[in-house]
């Protein structure tokens, strides 16, 4: 310890900087600094401390930590009582911690249920026990969890500016840079303005591009009604092929040939996303983890791969030949080419492409996997889908307008998104003192004070299964409910407010097109895994057992 203190004493604190942001100028009187007082205390007491055992020092240190926690909470409570925002707010129901200091019991339960693939069910059951909004304390940091649509509306819309992305930026930034999913404030506004024009109908309605990759997918699926096929992995490959085609004008072709470079990118992208998901799961312990060298290399492979396409797009803009010699992309519009017309910032283009690729691959694959999981267990729904497609399309592939008119098909999509939202749980962080409209008091209907720095967790998975919102059969797959009911903030598969998903129409169009073409191609679909649904939660939700089915051709 003496060595550490000596280093602190000798360190030139004026040399500190945060990237390009210089550190604040030190106080002119170093005697008033915390570091100086620590050093002075050590100089005075280091000799006397040598007589005490390590255990005694450890106990004293732990006691000091507990006292510090108690003092912090007392000061926070005093601040909360006197905050003008808190007038009218009532206490929030708290999770019944056994460890009231660090909240390790709460953390342990989360870790164990996650490993058992029951994390979302545990969250849902907690809401049923504690109420739709409750508080926790972990490592002396306050958190609020909610499945209340009014509170979620407040977080995402009404008081949108009161919240930031929290820890998402340091975790996802190494791969996604300054893209739309990892930016706040002006950076985020710039990203959204840059990307919005590229999700116009002309881009979203390119069904021929989807059909091209779907044809490759269908070639890999036996139609004899006897062979078992695992659809979940095929859907991931399909959405990666179609998303890269949509974004880069060049598909990875993971369902067919694919070059070695394309395959390397696909593998690196999957590894990078797994590493990001792991960091989110680790939470506060992420700082103790050694950097994963393979994951860091994967980040660089992904960014370098996309940079090659950005260079080609900029060359096309300036009338130069493609560095890759790819002639297939020059005559049609695609996302990257349009983006390159809007900005010269190559790093920004690369970052935005990687951000959209995550949504284009993972969320749509999650939806398709969950959709076919439930359809394989509801043959009567499958026959209704086939009947609607046959009546309205007469065996032809649908165009964009026809697709929009297939009401029962859309109801099946909505019902799947309700039960299995691709992003079932999300977080924000309060950037200032603010309030939630509900959750306080004995009945949970009074406003709640939210201090600056508080982590907000909102769980659409639990909200979508609330019987008071969706009826006593909320846990059941029943597409017919969408024929008579309309939902607002109770149904939130694509987020809401200013940050609502830009690509939701693309995802819905692609999923509906795939569903219709499958219904036209296969007479029956049968589940081949009798096990109940078990969650696999990474960045998106999937079935831990996959989607094993048998399909019989029409």
From Swiss-Prot:
Binding-site positions, heme: 501
Location, primary (coarse class): membrane
Top EC class for this record: oxidoreductase
Glycosylation site residues: 110, 328, 414, 425
Keywords linked to the UniProt accession: Glycoprotein, Heme, Iron, Membrane, Metal-binding, Monooxygenase, Oxidoreductase, Transmembrane, Transmembrane helix
Pathway assigned in UniProt: Secondary metabolite biosynthesis
Cofactor: heme
The protein's Enzyme Commission number: 1.-.-.-
Subcellular location: Membrane
Residue ranges of the TM segments: 52-72
InterPro entries: Cyt_P450, Cyt_P450_CS, Cyt_P450_E_CYP52_ascomycetes, Cyt_P450_E_CYP52_fungi, Cyt_P450_E_grp-II, Cyt_P450_sf
SUPFAM superfamilies the record matches: Cytochrome P450
GO molecular function: heme binding; iron ion binding; oxidoreductase activity, acting on paired donors, with incorporation or reduction of molecular oxygen, reduced flavin or flavoprotein as one donor, and incorporation of one atom of oxygen
Annotated Pfam families: p450 (PF00067)
An example Gene Ontology CC term for this record: membrane
Alphabetized Gene3D superfamilies for the sequence: Cytochrome P450 (1.10.630.10)
Mode of membrane association: Single-pass membrane protein
Role this protein plays: Cytochrome P450 monooxygenase; part of the him gene cluster that mediates the biosynthesis of himeic acid A, a ubiquitin-activating enzyme (E1) inhibitor. First, himA, together with the trans-enoyl reductase himH, catalyzes the formation of apolyketide chain, which is then condensed with leucine by the NRPS activity of himA. Dieckmann cyclization and release from himA gives a tetramic acid intermediate as the product of himA PKS-NRPS. HimG then catalyzes alpha-oxidation of the tetramic acid ring, with a subsequent rearrangement to yield apyrone intermediate.
Assigned protein family: Belongs to the cytochrome P450 family.
PANTHER family per the UniProt record, alphabetical: P450, PUTATIVE (EUROFUNG)-RELATED (PTHR24287:SF17)
Protein name, per record: Cytochrome P450 monooxygenase himC
Protein source organism: Aspergillus japonicus
Organismal lineage: Eukaryota, Fungi, Dikarya, Ascomycota, Pezizomycotina
Gene for this chain: himC
């Amino acid at each position: 310890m003496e060595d550490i203190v000596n280093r602190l004493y000798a360190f030139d604190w004026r040399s500190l900087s945060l990237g390009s942001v210089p550190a604040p100028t030190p106080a002119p009187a170093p005697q008033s600094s915390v570091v100086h007082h620590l050093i002075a205390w050590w100089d005075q007491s280091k000799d006397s401390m040598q007589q005490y055992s390590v255990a005694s020092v450890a106990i004293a240190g732990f006691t000091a930590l507990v006292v510090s926690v108690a003092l912090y909470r007392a000061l926070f409570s005093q601040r909360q009582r006197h905050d003008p925002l808190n007038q009218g707010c009532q206490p929030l129901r708290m999770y019944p911690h056994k460890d009231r200091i660090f909240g390790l019991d709460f953390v342990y339960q989360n870790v164990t249920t996650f490993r058992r693939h029951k994390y979302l069910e545990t969250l849902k059951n907690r809401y049923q026990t504690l109420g739709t909004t409750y508080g926790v304390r972990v490592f002396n940091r306050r958190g609020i969890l909610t499945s209340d649509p009014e509170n979620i509306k407040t977080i995402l819309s009404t008081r949108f500016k009161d919240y930031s992305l929290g820890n998402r930026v340091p975790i996802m930034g190494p791969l996604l840079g300054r893209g739309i999913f990892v930016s706040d404030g002006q950076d985020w506004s710039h990203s959204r303005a840059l990307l919005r024009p590229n999700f116009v109908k002309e881009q979203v309605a390119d069904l021929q591009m989807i059909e091209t990759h779907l044809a490759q997918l269908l070639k890999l699926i036996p139609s004899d009604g006897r062979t078992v096929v695992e659809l979940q992995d095929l859907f991931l490959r399909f959405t990666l092929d179609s998303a890269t085609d949509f974004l880069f004008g060049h598909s990875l072709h993971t369902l067919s040939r694919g070059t070695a470079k394309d395959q390397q990118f696909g593998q690196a992208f999957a590894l990078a996303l797994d590493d990001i998901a792991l960091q989110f799961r680790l939470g506060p312990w992420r700082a103790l983890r050694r950097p994963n060298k393979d994951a860091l290399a994967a980040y660089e492979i992904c960014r370098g791969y996309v940079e090659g396409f950005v260079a080609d797009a900029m060359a096309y803009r300036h009338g130069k030949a493609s560095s890759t010699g790819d002639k297939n992309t020059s005559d049609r519009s695609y996302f990257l080419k349009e983006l390159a017309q809007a900005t010269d910032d190559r790093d920004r283009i690369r970052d935005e492409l990687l951000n959209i690729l995550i949504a284009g691959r993972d969320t749509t694959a999650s939806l398709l996997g969950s959709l076919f999981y439930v359809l394989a267990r509801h043959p009567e729904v499958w026959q209704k889908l086939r009947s609607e497609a046959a009546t309205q399309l007469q065996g032809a592939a649908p165009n964009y307008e026809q697709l929009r008119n297939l009401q029962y098909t859309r109801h099946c999509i909505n019902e799947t998104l309700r039960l299995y939202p691709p992003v079932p749980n999300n977080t924000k962080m309060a950037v200032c003192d603010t309030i939630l409209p509900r959750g306080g008091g004995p009945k949970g209907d009074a406003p709640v004070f939210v201090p600056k720095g508080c982590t907000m967790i909102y769980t659409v998975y639990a909200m979508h299964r609330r019987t008071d919102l969706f009826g006593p059969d909320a846990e059941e797959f029943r597409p017919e409910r969408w024929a008579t009911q309309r939902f607002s903030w109770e149904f939130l598969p694509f987020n809401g407010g200013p940050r609502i998903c830009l690509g939701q129409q693309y995802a819905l169009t692609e999923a509906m097109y795939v569903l219709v073409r499958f219904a036209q191609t296969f007479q029956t679909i049968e589940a081949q895994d009798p096990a109940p649904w078990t969650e696999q939660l990474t960045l998106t939700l999937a079935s831990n057992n996959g989607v094993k089915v048998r399909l019989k051709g029409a």
